[in-house]
Amino acid sequence: MNINSTLFLQAVVFAILVWFTMKFVWPPITKALDERAQKIADGLAAADKAKSELSSANKRVEAELATSRTETATRLADADRRGQGIIEDAKARAVEEANKIIAAAQAEAAQQSVKAREALREQVALLAVKGAEQILRKEVNAGVHADLLSRLKTEL
């Protein structure tokens, strides 16, 4: 064979190989490469989407935490106010009860004082009558001199 015919035959075989490769080998390879590229692109898109969703979820969580903190602070302040109100009410009731007890004790003391004064007047009147009886050396009749004794009580 001649170089020219060999070269020509090699060129024909090469062309057939190129055609066969382009027709039967290359499309599945490009299809597999395209599918792989699509999977990678989908994975990257899913990763970006997940990243944005994570960022959004973190923002929502932070917002919820802030809301929860403010709500908790509000509830604590409200509970503190209620506690102070209850304490103030209890103090006011205690002061009111103490004032009632003091007023009752003062009234009872005044009543006891009046009773004691009356008892002292009675005793002083009896002592005065006994003293007068001893001075006069005669008996003073309490029934007869009741008017005199009552005036003596009022004067004392």
From Swiss-Prot:
Transmembrane stretches, start-end: 7-27
Gene3D superfamilies documented for this protein: 6.10.250.1580
Annotated InterPro entries: ATP_synth_B-like_membr_sf (IPR028987), ATP_synth_b/b'su_bac/chlpt (IPR002146), ATP_synth_F0_bsu_bac (IPR005864), ATP_synthase_B_chain (IPR050059)
MF terms in GO: proton-transporting ATP synthase activity, rotational mechanism; proton-transporting ATPase activity, rotational mechanism
Pfam families noted in UniProt: ATP-synt_B
Swiss-Prot/TrEMBL keywords: ATP synthesis, Cell inner membrane, Cell membrane, CF(0), Hydrogen ion transport, Ion transport, Membrane, Transmembrane, Transmembrane helix, Transport
Subcellular location(s) of the protein: Cell inner membrane
Function: F(1)F(0) ATP synthase produces ATP from ADP in the presence of a proton or sodium gradient. F-type ATPases consist of two structural domains, F(1) containing the extramembraneous catalytic core and F(0) containing the membrane proton channel, linked together by a central stalk and a peripheral stalk. During catalysis, ATP synthesis in the catalytic domain of F(1) is coupled via a rotary mechanism of the central stalk subunits to proton translocation. Component of the F(0) channel, it forms part of the peripheral stalk, linking F(1) to F(0).
Family: Belongs to the ATPase B chain family.
PANTHER family according to UniProt: ATP SYNTHASE SUBUNIT B, ATP SYNTHASE SUBUNIT B', CHLOROPLASTIC
Name of protein: ATP synthase subunit b
